[in-house]
């Protein structure tokens, strides 16, 4: 049985037993299989595969994120062609991946000699804040080599454009929900530490904010 078939079975189980949406993809091998189906214009699973690739691949530092970033790079460099993913949309998808391999790919593109690719990649990098030391070292080396895009990116970081150019928010925001998590709380996800094993599966993890008994009490 293929990994994709196993994933389809898992989707049905989650839906029927738990009432959950498909689990976000974090496995490189599964996503590679999905990409192969996207490339196959006649594949019966192509439409769903495109949705899983675009909207249901876990970002950050997962192995799947690495595969996704590389495929988007191929599209931008015109080494691969997907009708539904333009160069502009590929850059947009990279911008939402929040660090990890996507930053490495963006640096590859921003520091390239092709300005039609380097410039938009640099603009995306200006919005990214999850850079490793290896990433900043690449920018430093390019800056010292008089790379114009590297200078532009670093100047943007120095101005904190990634923060100051965020959309304005209301002066006053009414509190509509109060959450009291149990035990050690993660500040980025505001969730109980004793349920950390399920954090990558956000929808499943969200159920741990309240005991099943308490959820049923509210439902009743």
Residue ranges and their predicted role:
Residues 28-35, 59-78, 99-111, 130-142:
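Amphipathic alpha-helical scaffolding segments comprising HEAT/armadillo-like alpha-solenoid repeats
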Residues 8, 31, 69, 183-187, ...:
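Alpha-helix initiation and N-capping motif
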Residues 2-40:
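Amphipathic alpha-helical packing elements
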